[in-house]
Amino acid sequence: VDLMPLRENMRIEDPGPVLKAASGAAGIFACAASLLGAPSGFIGKIGVDSLSRMVTETLRAQNVDISHVIVSNEYQIGLAFLEYLPEGRNYQYYRNRSVGSLLRADELDEGYISGAYAVHFPGMLLDLTEEIRGACVQLVNLARKHGVLVSFDPNIRRELSADPAARDRMLWAVQHSDIVAPTLAEGQTLTGKTSIGDVLHALHAMGPRVVALTRDKDGAVISMDGKVAIAAGINYAPLDPTGAGDTFAAALCVGLQEGMSLERLAMFCNCAGTLVITQR
């Protein structure tokens, strides 16, 4: 769950109204895929607290299948406080041993996963607990066993990536994915390259067939099967950029499933991501 001050430049400790919203990269992805017309499901673990119920009700309202969401009384759902400050966005996470981070590999349903077109997971999960890391590895293994595409968004959060091994875990995920959708900055961090062409080449060399680089106001670049398509930036002042990358990644999977041309796919993903920034 995200909690966001409604007043610009307001810090969490300041008095004033705060907006709460069901969030999380994987949940946003699932909702976006559903809104874009694809059947989608969410695999995870929630608590018995009221905010956990808010999350499941949000998923249900967006027609996301929640039949594989486990309810546990072990812990409560994680929180993220988001500040919009003059120096940029700042996250403060309260998710140490949060219930979602305790999903285990043995709690995944192989039959459910085998029936998917693609599975998707964000990189921040790899920085939380041994349990969720094991679940991510099992998700990838089961998907590849059954010919299901693996989609990965590095979604690097500096606040969660203090572990020196974090980069190695991200690289493992890229190497075992069919589709990767980092920002250009994340791609540069993962590859050590600078130019768009070099970043694309280096990421493809790790294994993914489809590489998409988002560039905020400058649009996006998608590369697949030796071809590249560029979507120009859309001139719109963002109200709230939260979820734009997750929505872009969802549109990428939906567009691939629908067999869109590379040029149309780039435009489709870029437009979907841009729509998200027009509201909180």
Task: Show the residue positions of the predicted features.
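Glycine-rich phosphate/adenosyl-contacting loop at the front of the ribokinase-like
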Residues: 1-64, 237-239
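Short beta-strand scaffold segments in enzyme catalytic cores
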Residues: 31, 79-83, 219-222
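Structural alpha-helical scaffold elements that stabilize or flank donor/cofactor-binding regions
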Residues: 111-112, 172-173, 204
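Conserved N-terminal subdomain of the carbohydrate kinase-like
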Residues: 39-123
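Conserved beta-alpha-beta core of the PfkB/ribokinase-like small-molecule kinase fold
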Residues: 118, 124-201, 218-220
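Conserved phosphate-binding/catalytic region of the ribokinase-like
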Residues: 141-145, 192-280
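Short, conserved phosphate/pyrophosphate- and ester-handling motifs at nucleotide-, phospho-/glycolipid
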Residues: 33, 183, 245
